[in-house]
């Protein structure tokens, strides 16, 4: 439990325009019983849908090859809470959703914990490159060392203290 503060003010009290600048990928991704595409562009104005942006995001989140193998591609229905998908596929769709909204600040909360090591490393490398290209700041919460290898700064919370490790 906790809260996110910006200038000592709870983020829930800040204008929605500010909130749109922040993306979040939780450990447990919720997917609607809808298409992959609608789960990714969820929350975005459908009038602003951009197919080329979606394709770039699918590549960055390593979900493009999986989607291209499906007969209906991004129009494939995922079932209630992603029942037709693996945990790793659901996580990659969650990452794609967060990136599609084009935040300036992205929080990854154990966002790659259901991925195999190779896919995880590829996504982390892609996110590192994406963040440089898009001027995106990423805060990654993780217990895995390989996740931390892609971070420019590392902090550890220990005994209620924040310690800089890198």
Predicted regions and their residues:
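ABC ATPase NBD coupling module
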Residues: 10-23
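A short, proline-enriched helix->beta-strand linker immediately N-terminal to the Walker B motif
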Residues: 100-104
